[in-house]
């Protein structure tokens, strides 16, 4: 059985009973979307499995040792690379550390990170107002700013990935302000 199939079953079991805050849907919808995005982008089975498992350490009783035992060192390392450090205080600091952590872990971790961000941005409603600052809550604005910073990092490293293009499109659809494209010199 492919590792991703086992990962899906495990993630569904771990996330059983959890609901998404944004719409009350079963939480497992999010990891399934992340895994599907990775599959569509041509990722390998270990990467897809990591996408399906990416929230298990943060949101369930799972730990890295259990993931390593069940799914192998590579998949567990990818999950760890996209798992927030709960000991870092403050949203901005914690999210910046997570972005650096995914970046340092390499292209496969960045793909999982990108797929997660695409899925999370899709949870935000499309902004229809002229000025985002006039109508958007500070929480939403903070999240959009975080996702824009993630996009900048991802474009520097895996800019040719369809996931990065999707993230840009999703952000632009939800933003009254166009997302800045890095200059060619920035990408070098």
Annotated model-derived regions:
Residues 1-188:
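Active-site helical microenvironments for divalent-metal-assisted chemistry
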């Amino acid at each position: 059985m492919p590792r991703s199939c086992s990962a899906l079953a495990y993630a569904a079991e771990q996330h059983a009973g959890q609901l998404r805050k944004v719409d009350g849907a079963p939480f497992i919808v999010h990891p399934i979307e992340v895994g599907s995005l990775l599959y569509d982008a041509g990722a390998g089975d270990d990467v897809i499995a990591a996408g399906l498992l990416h929230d298990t350490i943060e949101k369930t009783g799972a730990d890295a040792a259990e993931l390593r035992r069940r799914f192998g060192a590579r998949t567990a390392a990818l999950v760890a690379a996209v798992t927030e450090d709960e000991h870092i205080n403050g949203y901005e600091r914690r999210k910046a550390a997570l972005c650096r952590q995914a970046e340092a872990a390499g292209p496969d971790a960045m793909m999982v990170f990108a797929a997660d961000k695409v899925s999370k941005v899709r949870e935000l409603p499309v902004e229809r107002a002229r000025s985002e600052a006039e109508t958007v809550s500070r929480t939403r604005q903070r999240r959009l700013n975080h996702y824009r910073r993630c996009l900048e990092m991802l474009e520097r490293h895996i800019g040719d990935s369809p996931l990065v293009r999707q993230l840009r499109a999703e952000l632009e659809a939800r933003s009254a302000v166009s997302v800045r494209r890095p200059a060619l010199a920035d990408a070098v």
